[in-house]
Amino acid sequence: TGSCCGPTFSSLSCGGGCLQPRYYRDPCCCRPVSCQTVSRPVTFVPRCTRPICEPCRRPVCCDPCSLQEGCCRPITCCPTSCQAVVCRPCCWATTCCQPVSVQCPCCRPTSCQPAPCSRTTCRTFRTSPCC
């Protein structure tokens, strides 16, 4: 489709083409073919320092705190400091859904939307609770 999406291989739209390992579930992230490979008896296994994400119709990477720190966003709004593929939970203020920190693990108030909280208790951030 002219993108890096696909189960194994895609076109030249991502830095000269890319390979996507089968264990990597993100349909819009790839590994460039220029990455170092290791010869195996049957296949070549790509090894990269980090995957490269490209924009999609619907973002598949996330930045729950909207801080572009530590979590992956589409490459059009992803800074160089974005390295993680798995997003961390946010810390949330007590009475509202505004994130106050990315010190995890923390939870958000049950009234917050859209995503549910993975934990029911929070660590404290300095002297104030996260939620």
Swiss-Prot record:
Q: Which UniProt keywords apply?
A: Keratin
Gene Ontology terms: cellular component: cytosol; keratin filament
Q: Does the keyword Kinase apply?
A: no
Expression across tissues: Wool.
Which ranges form a coiled coil? none
Q: Which domain of life is it from?
A: Eukaryota
Q: What is the stated purpose of this protein?
A: The keratin products of mammalian epidermal derivatives such as wool and hair consist of microfibrils embedded in a rigid matrix of other proteins. The matrix proteins include the high-sulfur and high-tyrosine keratins, having molecular weights of 6-20 kDa, whereas the microfibrils contain the larger, low-sulfur keratins (40-56 kDa).
> What PANTHER family is this protein classified in?
KERATIN-ASSOCIATED PROTEIN 2-1
- Name of the featured protein: Keratin, high-sulfur matrix protein, IIIA3
> Source species, please?
Ovis aries (Sheep)
